[in-house]
Amino acid sequence: MKKKKRHTLLKFLILAVMAGGVVLYSGVLQDTGGFPGQIRNQVYVEQKNAKAENYPGAAEKKTEKRTEISTENGTPEIEVTHGYAYETLTAEQQAVYDEVYRVIMAQDSKVKVSTCKEKVLEKAYRSVIADHGEIFWVSGYNYTQYTMGKKIVSIDFSPSYTMGRTERDYYQSQIDVVVDSILKNVEPSWGDYEKAKYVFEYLAGNIEYEMGTEQNQNIISVFLNKKTVCQGYANATQYLLTLLGIPAVVVTGTAEGDTHAWNLVQLDGAYYFMDTTWGNSSYNNGESGFSSFINYNYFGVTTAEISKTHQADGTLLLPDCTATADNYYVREGKYITEWNPDVVGQIYGTAYQNVVVTEAVRFLNTSLYDQAKGYLIFCLII
């Protein structure tokens, strides 16, 4: 998909920058004859693997749920990690979620799931993927339906692995080193907002958006290649926030007509949307010189705000996000709702004195924006 370009004030002042969308995943469905059932192949592009560490604040959260279930073939018990998507499922879908997660983590070839409904299986699989941005060794799945006459009596689920267990373990060890180096900078005193802002800034500021990079639908491209697309950004955001004890899930859909992925996160007990891809200035303004600018317009936004550009595909039942306390501009005191030259002057004057290359401020309306721009220009702040 093509990059979208938006331009606001040049040079020192950056105001309310908007970004563009990227490719998420493609789906393939094939039917072939089989006895006594049918085989259908589906491919979704998303990734995950789960590894919990004791990073500051990780143990304080209560939303993550785990279930220990023994596998039928006697392999070691797999601790099933549940996230936001799991909580939106029916009891039947939740049971299949556990079965899908278990076989993926064990990297077994197949499992007979406890449903005969292909839509239930698809919902469970996509929910596992949405909850687990760390799974990078699966690109989709095959399923085999077994029938008696016209009645489906059972379904086998077979993950489509992109690598063997040895290669997976190798990549995971490399990812662990990078992730540890990122999260070691998190301060024990930080709350949800500070942790989420750190993850957002790290990914938006250090990972380049590039369509053609290898493994761009998973976290390998993010942590090892430092180049990715929206799916990689969203998966990495979910993974890092989960390790920090912040509930997060990957949301898929479209943004300005292009397939896209972003995140739903819970900060201080309230839900917000976050789009790390659109936080990367090089994605939108790579040709205008703002290579180090971070766009905060999609950090901690409401449903009403994100719906102007993003449309979820219905995979997840999403809440109506109305909280604004942890929106970047509100939290940082950079959301201007009424004209006050002293406030605006102080924000940009401080940034100028601190040699901040760009400063982002959001205004309630165009009239306030124009007032601020004129005021700053005539006061020779820029």
Predicted regions, residues:
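N-terminal accessory/pre-domain segments preceding catalytic cores
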Residues: 2-190, 306-382
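Short, exposed beta-strand "edge-strand" segments with a Pro/Gly-rich flavor and a Y/T-containing core
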Residues: 83-87, 184-190, 216, 287-304
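Sterically constrained small-residue positions within well-ordered secondary structures
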Residues: 104, 148, 221, 254-256, ...
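Secondary-structure boundary elements
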Residues: 165-222
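Catalytic cysteine-centered active-site loop
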Residues: 210-217, 227, 248-258
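Periplasmic OmpA-like peptidoglycan-binding domain that tethers envelope proteins to the cell wall
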Residues: 222-231
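Hydrophobic/aromatic-rich core segments of domains that either
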Residues: 232-305
